[in-house]
Amino acid sequence: AANIGFNESFSFIAEFGEHGNRQQQDTLGKERLTKINELYAIPYHVGAGLNYLGNYLGDDVLAKSIKSFSKSRGRVPLKNILAEITDKETEWFFDTYLTDREAYDLSIKRLIKGQESIRLTVSEKNSKPVPFKLDLIKDDQLISEKWIEHSGRDTIIELKTLDADFVAINSNRFLPEKNRPNNWKYLKSNSGLKPLKLTFYGDSENLKRNQLFYHPISDFNAYDGFTGGMRIYNTRVKNQPFEIDLHPQYSLKEQSMVGFFRTRYRFINHKSKNYLNQLFLTGKSYHYNTNLRYTSIQPSFSMYFRPYDLRSNKRQLFNISWFNVFRDRDPNIQVSPDYSVLNILHRYNNSDAVNVFATNSNVEASNEFGKFYFSTNYRKLFPSGRQFAVRLFAGKFLWNNISANDGNYFDFNLNRATDYLFRYDYLGRSEDTGIWSQQFVPAEGGFKAFFDDSSANDYMVSINASVGIWKWIEFYGDVGILKNRNRSAKTYFDSGFKFSLVPDYFEIFFPLYSSNGFEPTQARYATTIRFVFTPRLSTLSSLFTRKWF
């Protein structure tokens, strides 16, 4: 594990908010702060800044100034007291560090090595002035340090190497930064690249190494059976600009390699409502039926928006994705095994602990079809602990060039979405009978009861509602209308009881009454019971690690 000292922990904790672009100015009033900033991020950020300022000034200058400030009972500003005691510049602390919510980003931009000396350029990304300490490290020991005034413009420095292993800016981590790894350069390599280190499970930053983490993983689906493998990733405790996540696995049932990967690059904007942009490239390859493999490659771009007031819960997302699917041909599916679909998504969310409201608007386009679909969710938690939830879904084909002979693969579905983009965690996505066909994924129509004619190639509208009865038992009801081309519209309904044993991860639905009639008296009632279940440990663990921001 990376070793972090007590004083270093102040900046380490302060950086959590900065890396997620959730931090606020230290000078804001309490009434304008989010809980995480009020209780943790800002106190730690101020503490880290004072510690850094004290180290920079030296000779107990800061301690003496704070003592004088206390004696004056705040009548004389600390900034003025410091100006009388020291000739060193302190405006950077009061005018920038405390008032600018964007963290510093110092970096060693250029490094030229000589026989016994080096020449390097230190830059601050936003041209903000700040003093920094330039260190030489050998055998994990600090052998030289020097404080340097940085005016905001690039600073060129020459110094003796002293046979050091590393040159580093602020090796003690006292100053919070948003990209600390670029503070270090390895002097024993011509390229300056740091050595690679493989570490079991994620950790905090080891600034002397380029880190890759790994740990074992397992998964399950009906066609690959149990899969086991290794997760390899560079994701640290704090968000990084570039992240890569590889999940190579071996399928015991198919006796072949499967898995997925994801790469992400983050662009943070601290001074805009468009506070975050992300570029993704993801891919996966598993089996969607016995001996039938699918591979999906998806480049995407996301833009995230929020109000300037971070206490507001309003959030918006705009995403554009290009899904490319390649499948082994299934004789039971007539459409081409390979296809590409453009998806454009807008998402709006305004939720708190009591009220949840969210909308999703999607447009999909391909050579075969174009469609628009919209969903909105509302959930309210009452003081008694009961909750009421309602969801609306509406979808319409804009064009549809799929012939009737090609089946309903791309159609809307009332009770079991086809998932032709392979986005949902179906355990048995091609099953029509058996336990895996009873898995419920809350998508499209959202019905729990099964109907013989549940797909629509023209339009579909449905409403799903549920209300708490007692603790984890709820009553649900659904109503919907669907229409196929050249056929009359049909209306369906269903109702029943939902047991939320582990909400969103393990739930069971018992149908009661539907368009089929009284469900418990129907033949093979057990086959109509639906369930929500995820076997992925990483997904289940998120139930216990949901962020509080």
List PLM regions with ranges:
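Outer-membrane beta-barrel "beta-signal"
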Residues: F499-D504, Y525-F549
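C-terminal outer-membrane beta-barrel translocator/porin domains of Gram-negative envelope proteins
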Residues: S218, Q278-N289, S300-S302, L342-G468, ...
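Beta-strand-rich binding/interaction modules
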Residues: V61, T86, T90-F93, L106, ...
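Transmembrane beta-strand segments that form the barrel wall of outer-membrane beta-barrel proteins
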Residues: K67, N210-A222, G228-R236, Q240-L252, ...
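Residues that define the transmembrane beta-barrel architecture of outer-membrane proteins
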Residues: N210, D224-G228, Q255-G259, Y275, ...
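Amphipathic alpha-helical substructures
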Residues: R32-K113
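Outer-membrane beta-barrel initiation region
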Residues: I148-E149, T155-D163, N170-K273, N291, ...
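Acidic/His/Gly-enriched intrinsically disordered linker/tail segments
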Residues: A1-A48
